[in-house]
From Swiss-Prot:
NCBIfam families, per database record: TrpR
GO cellular component terms, semicolon-separated: cytoplasm
Pfam families per record: Trp_repressor (PF01371)
Function: This protein is an aporepressor. When complexed with L-tryptophan it binds the operator region of the trp operon (5'-ACTAGT-'3') and prevents the initiation of transcription. The complex also regulates trp repressor biosynthesis by binding to its regulatory region.
Major subcellular site: cytoplasm
Alphabetized GO MF terms: DNA-binding transcription factor activity; sequence-specific DNA binding
Stated name of the protein: Trp operon repressor
Organism from which the protein derives: Serratia proteamaculans (strain 568)
């Protein structure tokens, strides 16, 4: 997959530097099998739960079997969170969408 831009226009210059430092740290943690303890160190239990919920939102939106309201009730997420997920998915590159489909829907999970 080609990377379009390393900079996130929603972040300040310092915010982008911090984000890229985090991404590099995360990549290195996977390479050294330290990703699980790193994420537990950096994220609270609530933040880890929220990330898991966001993955489920993307998965269910891609599956296309539930309305946003049904997702809200099923996952206990706010409608704004689901709408943000939907809008982000619409803005994702075709390559990312294809990769997500393989990862999240490939095994009929």
């Amino acid at each position: 997959m080609t990377q379009l831009s390393l900079n996130d226009p929603a972040l300040s210059e310092q915010g982008n530097e911090d984000w890229l430092r985090f991404v590099a740290l995360l990549q290195n943690s996977f390479a050294q099998d330290l990703h699980q303890p790193l994420m537990q160190l950096l994220l609270t239990p609530d933040e880890r739960t929220a990330l898991g919920t966001r993955v489920r939102i993307i998965q269910e939106l891609m599956r296309g079997e539930m309305s946003q309201r049904e997702l809200k009730n099923e996952l206990g997420a706010g409608i704004a969170t689901i709408t943000r997920g939907s809008n982000s998915l619409k803005a994702a590159t075709p390559a990312l969408k294809q990769w997500l489909e393989q990862q999240l829907l490939g095994d009929a999970q």
